[in-house]
């Protein structure tokens, strides 16, 4: 008990440091961003509650349903206590790692678990069955209830998690001292906001053990650096490849390690690969919009690619929002008679945002006005804001396990390159991000043919070059039906391919791993589910399928090219300095 008392005192001391770290920026006048978010959430949940509470009969029915569930849990607990076998009223998903500890099957903790599951299932059903809500409000309410349900799980609290109780008793509370220390450090790192560590950030460094493919930065603007990768084959395909990654994350997800690198694999296939590395913008770039990213990003890169290789045309690859910008750029080029792009590959790219997934819950006029107000004050959207939004999409994987591990078990997270990249967030210029949210998520103007860029109306039907469009089956950011509908807007031949897994793992899937699968089928157009029903499944990675499609376009080869050619003196080694800039 003496050791426990000493550790309790240490925990209180570390807790004081955590409170001080949280309060410091607020005492200095930093606005609390949570106020607007909480008000919006309460308004949304209030609309659901109003439906059930406005009619006494409905209200009684809802309460009775919940009470019946609790009575079933109570009856089952009594059966267990008397030594009888009881069938659970509510079962956790077999894949749910929160309740894997055997102690969750004991009468007390099983009743606690089932009470939680009954309550969360009931709350979700209240939203699902509420009538008279517009689709966006219902979608947002479902998302918010899911977030709340995930947050209040008994596995997230010391006194209701049997594993944490054992850990605390066996270590005399040392886990809580370490956990409070971790909490204070993360609040300091987040400058008063909680920046949950998902991995050991000291284990990785871009350019040291990540983003290692050899190459040179041959050209740069204030928005991007252009990297040309060194060849690994004596000859290469005549027409070069330009990759346009997202600026919401950093490009090295495509070059994490040599074993996982799509960039290295393409180079080894005999391609001359160029990649745009976007700048991590600050307030000086606040007014840079979508058209600037087109001109000083893609167009400037195409000019440099032509000078470096002598080739007028290039094949392009766009990933996520980089693909959306590329699609808009291709429509602009089609309208202005610019033929510098020979083909395009879209990786988990949305052009039509009708079914854009859970990210849509963050975008309506009220929320967007708040975001734009914050961006106007700073000149950009903080990288942490987007990182938090992405983590909330999978909070049971990317938030709460780390809360338990870091702050209640007092452990350090394991080194994991993917999660290092996930935490290496970037800022977004105010003008660019506002255009993207309004024209894509809020108004869907690109798909409707109402969007303009640099004074030109965008018509995706004018894009007639060959296209390879990849979606991933479990994508929560760019859902496959959304990518499918967008691909159907294009005016040329489209090979639509569906890969297994999600937004990252489905794309970065080296063939040597023999993981997942992909599906191929007929042309786009019509219903996605009909396409999927008729699609053929193939084992393994989609990369070889893409290589076969790509090779048929321009099979001619030339001697391998060194980065920059005779036109450019390399500025620095890949991956360059832009990608190293922290948010």
Swiss-Prot record:
UniProt KW keywords: Acyltransferase, Cytoplasm, PHB biosynthesis, Transferase
One annotated GO biological process: poly-hydroxybutyrate biosynthetic process
GO molecular function, one term: acyltransferase activity
Pfam families assigned to the protein according to its UniProt record, in alphabetical order: Abhydrolase_1 (PF00561), PhaC_N (PF07167)
Biased composition (Basic and acidic residues): 574-583
Positions of the AB hydrolase-1 domain: 300-508
Catalytic activity: (3R)-3-hydroxybutanoyl-CoA + [(3R)-hydroxybutanoate](n) = [(3R)-hydroxybutanoate](n+1) + CoA
Catalytic residue positions: 320
Source taxon at top rank: Bacteria
Subcellular location: Cytoplasm
E.C. designation(s): 2.3.1.-
GO terms under cellular component: cytoplasm
Main location: cytoplasm
Annotated segments matching region Disordered: 560-583
Pathway given in the UniProt record: Biopolymer metabolism; poly-(R)-3-hydroxybutanoate biosynthesis
Task performed by this protein: Polymerizes D(-)-3-hydroxybutyryl-CoA to create PHB which consists of thousands of hydroxybutyrate molecules linked end to end. PHB serves as an intracellular energy reserve material when cells grow under conditions of nutrient limitation.
The family this protein is said to belong to: Belongs to the PHA/PHB synthase family. Type I PhaC subfamily.
Stored PANTHER family: POLY(3-HYDROXYALKANOATE) POLYMERASE SUBUNIT PHAC, POLY-3-HYDROXYBUTYRATE SYNTHASE
Name of the protein in its database record: Poly(3-hydroxyalkanoate) polymerase subunit PhaC
Source organism of this protein record: Azorhizobium caulinodans (strain ATCC 43989 / DSM 5975 / JCM 20966 / LMG 6465 / NBRC 14845 / NCIMB 13405 / ORS 571)
């Amino acid at each position: 008990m003496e050791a426990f008392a000493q550790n309790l005192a240490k925990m209180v001391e570390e807790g004081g440091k955590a409170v001080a770290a949280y309060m410091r920026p607020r005492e200095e006048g930093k606005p609390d961003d949570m106020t607007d978010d909480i008000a919006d959430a309460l308004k949304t949940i209030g609309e659901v509650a109003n439906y059930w509470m406005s009619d006494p009969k409905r209200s009684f029915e809802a309460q009775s349903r919940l009470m019946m569930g609790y009575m079933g849990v109570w009856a089952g607990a009594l059966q267990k206590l008397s030594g009888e076998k009881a069938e659970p009223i509510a079962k956790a998903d077999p894949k749910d790692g929160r309740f894997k500890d055997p102690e969750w099957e004991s009468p007390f903790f099983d009743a606690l678990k089932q009470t939680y599951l009954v309550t969360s299932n009931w709350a979700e059903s209240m939203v699902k069955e509420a009538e008279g809500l517009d689709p966006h409000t219902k979608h947002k309410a479902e998302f918010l209830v899911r977030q709340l349900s995930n947050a209040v799980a008994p596995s997230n609290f010391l006194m209701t998690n049997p594993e944490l109780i054992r850990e605390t008793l066996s270590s005399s509370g040392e886990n809580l001292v370490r956990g409070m220390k971790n909490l204070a450090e993360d609040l300091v790192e987040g400058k008063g906001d909680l920046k949950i560590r998902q991995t050991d950030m000291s284990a990785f460094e871009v350019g040291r053990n990540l983003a290692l493919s050899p190459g040179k930065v041959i050209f740069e603007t204030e928005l991007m650096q252009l990297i040309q990768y060194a060849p690994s084959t004596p000859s290469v395909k005549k027409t070069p490849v330009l990759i346009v990654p997202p600026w919401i994350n950093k490009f090295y997800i495509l070059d994490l390690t040599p074993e996982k690198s799509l960039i290295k694999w393409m180079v080894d296939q005999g391609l001359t690969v160029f990649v745009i590395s976007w700048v991590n913008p600050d307030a000086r770039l606040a007014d840079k919009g979508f058209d600037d990213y087109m001109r000083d990003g893609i167009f400037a890169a195409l000019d440099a690619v032509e000078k470096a290789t002598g080739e007028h045309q290039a094949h392009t690859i766009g990933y996520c929002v980089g693909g959306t910008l590329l699609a808009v750029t291709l429509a602009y080029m089609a309208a202005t008679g610019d033929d510098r792009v020979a083909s395009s590959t879209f990786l988990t790219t949305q052009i039509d945002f009708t079914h854009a997934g859970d990210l849509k819950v963050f975008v309506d006029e009220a929320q967007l006005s708040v975001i734009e107000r914050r961006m106007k004050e700073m000149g950009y959207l903080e990288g942490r804001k987007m990182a938090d939004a992405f983590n909330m999409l999978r909070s049971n994987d990317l938030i709460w396990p780390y809360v338990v591990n870091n702050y209640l078990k007092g452990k350090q997270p394991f080194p994991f390159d993917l999660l290092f990249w996930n935490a290496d967030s970037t800022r977004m210029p105010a003008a660019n991000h506002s255009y993207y949210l309004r024209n894509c998520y809020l108004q869907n103007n690109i798909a409707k043919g109402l969007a303009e860029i640099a004074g030109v109306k965008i018509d995706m039907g004018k894009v007639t070059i060959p296209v390879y469009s990849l979606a991933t089956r479990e994508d929560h950011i760019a859902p496959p039906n959304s990518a499918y509908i967008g691909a159907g807007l294009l005016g040329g031949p489209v090979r639509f391919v569906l890969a297994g897994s999600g937004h990252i793992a489905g794309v970065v899937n080296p063939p040597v791993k023999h993981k997942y699968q992909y599906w191929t089928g007929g042309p786009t157009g019509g219903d996605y589910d009909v396409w999927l029903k008729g699609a053929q499944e193939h084992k393994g990675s989609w990369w070889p399928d893409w290589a076969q499609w790509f090779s048929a376009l321009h099979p001619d080869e030339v001697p391998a090219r060194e980065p920059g050619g005779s036109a450019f003196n390399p500025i620095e080694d890949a991956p360059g300095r832009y990608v190293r800039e922290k948010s």
